[in-house]
Amino acid sequence: MKEIAAAVIRRDGRLLLCRRAERPGDSCAGLWEFPGGKREPGESLEDCLVRECREELGVQVKPLRVREQLTHIYPEITVRLTFFDAELTGGEPEARVHTALVWALPEEWDRYPVCPADRPLLERFREEETP
């Protein structure tokens, strides 16, 4: 099982979503996800989150708290995702490994098909946003 740290970054009521690049054998290619990535040996999940956001987005983030942990089984891999609420502390996100980035409002989320592992968290956000 691969350990993944993912950042939930908000700005003005919007969530940052990233579109995955097309890669052979990647069942999430072309879908949208929260930024983050795989933990390296000996690395804490918080350090993983900071490193992945720096490498993939060119930004500094501060992990604030664990929002949720989920396990998902893809055809090619089983992952355990730890979603952190994170504060953007330096830089402006840029798509270094993704094909696109978007700051999406809740009413726009349906326009962005997300990876199956991220879908439950996005649905919970939708419930929180509904009066």
Task: Label the predicted regions.
Residues 83-85, 94-126:
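NUDIX/MutT-family hydrolases
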Residues 9-10, 17, 88, 103:
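Conserved hydrophobic "DFG−1" position in protein kinase catalytic cores
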Residues 14, 22, 71:
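Short, glycine/serine-rich, charged loops/turns that create anion-binding
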